[in-house]
Amino acid sequence: MITDHYNRNIDYIRISITDRCNLRCRYCMPEDISFVGHDKILRYEEITRIVQILAQRGITKVKITGGEPLVRHECTDLIREIKEIPGIEMVTLTTNGILLQSMLPKLLEAGVDAVNVSLDTFQRARYEHLTGKDACEMVLAGIQDAYKSGIPLKLNCVPIEGENTDELSEFFSWAKRKQIAVRFIEMMPIGYGKTYKSVPSDEILRQFFEAYPDAYRLEKSLGNGPAVYYSAPGFAGEIGVIGAIHEKFCNTCNRIRLTSEGFLKLCLYSGEGLDLRAMLRGGCSDEEIAEAVTKVIERKPKAVSYTHLNFRKVLILIFM
């Protein structure tokens, strides 16, 4: 088990396999964004090797993210390979859902354990306004097929004042009707997100309890993330809130992040970490990499710091 200086056991890694995306969400990735060269992106065999090394040190859970992970060719082969690594207990995926319907059979065959789908609106015109693509029906079809398959499913919604807050009741209704966890992620007021007004988690909960007075907080955790979950009598699913600003969750953080360029981040909001790509391509042994990772994780920050950030990369890591 890898433990940091504050005795937090690190057993979960989020791996971004690409910085590319087939949407241009206004708060995340505008039209004029520039991308990293393919030669700088970790190859699948490099990602697999990193996970093998980390699994030997106690990492048991892996989340595959992007950008949009499903746009990378043969990503399901990577999922299958990671699933076969001894010690890895769970491999999950976060996607915008555009390609979910077409790729669902391969994802299920690869053994993905759960899927998170990012969806901020159920309205076709609003979806196109927020994302730059008329694909709402495609995403909803993918969600429906995934739900029918029985795979554990979560929806991630970023509530934005004046953009989609009038749909909160519909998101609540989804959690009531379907065995799905609907999670509301607080907007970060950094980078492109500064131009939008976030909705605090307590406002989400106020509206939820107003609509469902008998609602209650769940004591159990659903999955590996920091969300706090609630339900109500008659609900098939749950709602969750992730208060990135107003309710920090640093004291229980159990995760590290690997960027698509091979940089191991200790904290989403910190520049500290380790260039694993340089070590891999520089000929370092597995033991040398393992020792370097163990040492750098000991320096994992106690709490969030918002200084010296690459805001574009932070936003992509938050919402993808």
Give a label for each model feature.
Residues 5-44, 268:
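Canonical Radical SAM [4Fe-4S] cluster-binding loop centered on the CxxxCxxC motif
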Residues 307-310:
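Conserved small/polar residues in nucleotide/adenosyl-binding loops
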Residues 23, 124-125, 248, 274:
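Glycine-centered loop/turn positions within well-structured domains
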Residues 191-305:
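Accessory C-terminal segments flanking Radical SAM cores
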Residues 314-320:
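Cationic, amphipathic, low-complexity alpha-helical segments enriched
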